[in-house]
Amino acid sequence: LERINKRSFEIGYAVMHTSGQGFMMAFQAGGPHAQDRGLEAVAYGYTAMMHTPQSAVWTKPQGKHDPLVLNKTFTTVGRGIGLVIGCSTFPTWNTYPGMFADLITGNPVIVKPHPAAILPAAISVKIAQEVLSENGLPAHIVSMVIDEDGSKPGTAELATREEIKLIDFTGNTPFGNWLEANCTQAQVYTEKAGVNTVIIDSTDDY
């Protein structure tokens, strides 16, 4: 996150030129606000793991015999590979939470950006890979996959693979619903379009 923060302007311009947002919106949402969401995910993930006791002692009385005593230890284990499916309008703001939540809880992650907003995700993934390598970890703990043909997305095929255990999706409601119904091997989190229909009417009698 610190390394990403140092390249906020570069990422802001990348968001602007891919999403169509004006620079101020692209910078604030694609830069500091997105990083804030990533940091929030790290904090929540760490807090959740720390709420689980690392050890416990279980004792069972045995009447006139010595009690049975078990010293238990608990180890946090990741679920498996995470898949983060990004959207075109806010490609980092909606990618960082899932990406960093997966990482802090011990899961490798594949970032699948929207075909219209690849560059901001690519910069972020490259930074993550550099940091991982510098710390002696496999760079491809964070990976990215893009469609060879943007008009023929392979997201559904990827999302239903047995290896994928966590899915974080932002996008349209029909595909979000499809993921929830069909990706039964994974824990699926979706941020879909608005759920409430609104009718705005007017009058010529004010």
Question: Where are the language model's segments positioned?
Answer:
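N-terminal Rossmann-like NAD(P)+-binding subdomain of aldehyde/semialdehyde dehydrogenases
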Residues: 1-65, 101, 134
